[in-house]
């Protein structure tokens, strides 16, 4: 009996640590200062607890940045908003050009949390955050993401 109680305690502690670590997007990402960018989807995964997406962003000088991101919303909320797995995967297939509203990772690098996605027609593609606004470094609504000189490198 003591063995089972110990095992149950261990499982509960591990689960609690995972849950508290997971629900920290404001700690992990700068969601107060969102930026926008046009990007090309390279991979989209409709996963729990949050879908993930890889995208390429081309700078004005032609340099391509390869980004990893997760969506703020979860598959259950996406489905309730009409974005089923098949519809989301079709809308975000590799090669699709989208406008993203992103909160950059607080540790630097090319990772972030996507708060909103629009297609080339300006329609909200995935998610329920239609009121999200992004700015560029000059403070222009709907602007572009700050350049590499404005981001710190990971672990600095």
Feature annotation, model-predicted:
Residues 123-156:
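Extended, charge-rich, solvent-exposed interface segments
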Residues 1-4:
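Positively charged n-region of N-terminal signal peptides that target proteins for export
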């Amino acid at each position: 009996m003591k063995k089972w109680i110990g095992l149950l305690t261990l499982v509960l502690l591990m689960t609690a640590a995972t849950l508290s670590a997971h629900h920290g997007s404001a700690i992990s990402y700068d969601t107060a200062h969102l930026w926008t960018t046009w990007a090309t989807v390279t991979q989209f995964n409709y996963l729990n607890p949050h879908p993930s997406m890889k995208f390429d962003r081309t700078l004005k000088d032609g340099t391509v940045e390869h980004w990893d991101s997760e969506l703020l919303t979860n598959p259950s909320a996406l489905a309730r908003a009409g974005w089923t797995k098949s519809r989301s995967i079709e809308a975000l297939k590799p090669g699709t050009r989208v406008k993203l509203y992103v909160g950059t990772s607080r540790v630097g690098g090319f990772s972030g949390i996507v708060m909103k996605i629009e297609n080339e027609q300006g329609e909200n593609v995935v998610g329920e955050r239609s009121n999200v606004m992004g700015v560029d470094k000059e403070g222009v609504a709907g602007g572009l993401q700050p350049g590499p000189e404005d981001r710190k490198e990971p672990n600095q």
